[in-house]
Design a protein with these regions (language model features):
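Active-site nucleotide/adenylate-binding loops and adjacent lid/helix of ATP-dependent enzymes
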Residues: 74-168
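ATP-dependent carboxylate activation and anion-phosphoryl transfer catalytic cores
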Residues: 15, 202-203, 213-306
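Phosphate-binding site of ATP-dependent enzymes
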Residues: 146-206, 210-228, 239-247
Length: 306
């Protein structure tokens, strides 16, 4: 997509490809993989994940293994409304939520959530990296650069500007500690579950996090993995409710942007996912260290060629 992508400076060979959700993305990707004898592909964005998982069988027939579950599982987990609905039907506890079809339903659900006394959350059913996420509440700090709140009346004004009603999910606000959990599974059987406490985030990604032991979080994630039948790497995000229960609010059925933190903790989940994909064995158990991650920006300088 970008000729000056910073990642080009950290790899042996690079290509500019179409957007992950474009019609010819997978055909271009397959051609590149065959040309370079690539046998594993790692989707790193939702658009790429959906396109690649949809054509997974075609890749596999050519000896190219995508690190992801099948398309039906991927879509059901990625689409926030379907994900919450599916887990609720399987008796997995989830936050209170609603999939509104019009403005009037939003007003009704806001009252049920206890608004304006209690805030609630609104987000697109399909989006990544925190895009479109808002906390609906009456009071907010205007001078906070990370302010992601919106008043109900302003939310309604925004939605009324669209010709077609947006597909959104309304969800109860979870006030407790937040966890991003990287997991590795094999045909629905959890192999590794590594909770990481999200201490500080910038937009969607964590910039301060801590790999910790949390049995309640691990137990909930294990149930979710088995219910969906995830295969290989997945990331599951949870937050504690007011009743002190960790509840899932988002699932990324792919590697996460912060998977590197697990390597620092002693478990290289990305490497293990690749090994499983190509039929190699991985350690059944590896001790994990608690570790804190601080993320920062670094520059790459490109000198003009004379």
């Amino acid at each position: 997509m970008q000729k000056d992508a910073v990642g080009f400076h950290f790899v042996d060979k690079s290509y500019v490809v179409p957007k992950g959700d474009s019609k010819n993305y997978t055909s271009v990707l397959m051609e590149i993989a065959e040309k370079n004898d690539i046998n594993v592909i790692i989707p790193c964005s939702d658009e790429e994940l959906l396109s690649i998982s949809k054509e997974k069988d075609k890749f596999v027939k050519k000896g190219i293994i995508p690190i992801c579950s099948d398309y039906e599982t991927v879509y059901k987990a990625n689409e926030k409304g379907l994900m919450l609905k599916f887990l609720k039907e399987k008796n997995i506890r989830v936050p209170r939520f609603c999939l509104p079809k019009n403005i009037e339903e939003i007003k009704e659900v806001a009252k049920e959530f206890g608004y304006p006394h209690n805030p609630f959350v609104v987000k697109p059913r399909l989006a990544r990296g925190g895009r479109g996420f808002k906390i609906v509440k009456e009071q907010s700090d205007f001078f906070d650069s990370r302010n992601n709140s919106i008043k109900l009346r302003h939310l309604i004004d925004v939605l009324e500007d669209y010709e077609e009603f947006l597909e959104i999910v309304l969800m109860e606000y979870l006030p407790g500690e937040e966890y991003s959990v990287d997991a590795l599974a094999y045909n629905g059987e959890p192999l590794y579950i590594i909770p990481r406490k999200r201490i500080k985030a910038l937009g969607g990604p964590s910039i301060v996090g801590e790999v910790v032991q949390n049995d309640d979080v691990k137990s909930m994630v294990s149930k979710i993995i088995k219910t969906f039948g995830f295969h290989l790497n997945a990331n599951i995000q949870l937050k504690y409710s007011i009743e002190k229960v960790p509840l899932v609010y988002e699932i990324n059925p792919r590697v996460s942007g912060t998977i590197v933190a697990n390597d620092a903790a002693g478990v290289n989940l990305l490497y293990y996912g690749i090994k499983l994909a190509v039929g190699q064995e991985i350690p059944k158990y590896k001790p994990m260290r608690n570790v804190k991650m601080l993320r920062y920006f670094e520059e790459v300088f490109i000198h003009e060629q004379k």
